[in-house]
């Protein structure tokens, strides 16, 4: 009986420790911000300053009227593709995780990786795809006005993303 209990407790310990290691794996991986854990003073880092979108086009003038600021977090599964769309308003963001490939209707492409700042195209039709091996987490900031869409889809565009 004692031997059976001892074996049972040993097996239970292995299962619990193995299970815990498996379930806690994501929390054990290093934070992308671990490099800042030991700073002793406030730091400021300019991630991006531009008047152009990622494809080199000049950003439009600001809208007239009362602004509405919108912050969105997008999460894209591995291999997912966004439909062809355009943005009627200025928007920019930070890719927190993953790898995003953006393709313009004209064929221009941009690969964005975790930690990169991105300034989106305003007006031109484009699409995006998760080309990495983990889900994308993308935080985007929109400078818009109440009632304006953040994006307009173009189902009429049948061009495959290459």
Which functions belong to the PLM regions below?
Residues 87-106:
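Glycine- and acidic-residue-biased ligand/ion/polar-headgroup-sensing regions
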Residues 76, 106-123:
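Short acidic-glycine-tyrosine-enriched beta hairpin
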């Amino acid at each position: 009986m004692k031997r059976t209990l001892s074996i049972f407790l040993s097996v239970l310990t292995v299962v619990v420790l193995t299970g815990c290691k498996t379930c806690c794996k994501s929390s054990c991986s290093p934070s992308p911000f671990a490099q800042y854990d030991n700073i002793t003073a406030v730091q400021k880092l300019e991630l991006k300053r531009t008047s152009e979108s990622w494809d080199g086009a000049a950003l439009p003038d600001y809208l007239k009227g009362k602004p509405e600021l919108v912050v969105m977090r997008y999460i894209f599964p591995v291999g997912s593709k966004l439909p062809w769309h355009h943005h009627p308003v200025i928007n920019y963001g930070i890719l927190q995780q993953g790898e995003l490939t953006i393709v313009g209707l004209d064929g221009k492409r941009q690969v964005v990786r975790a930690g990169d700042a991105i300034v989106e195209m305003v007006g031109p039709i484009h699409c995006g795809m998760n080309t990495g091996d983990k889900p994308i987490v993308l935080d985007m900031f929109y400078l818009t006005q109440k009632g304006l869409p953040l994006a307009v889809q173009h189902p009429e565009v049948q061009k495959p993303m290459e």
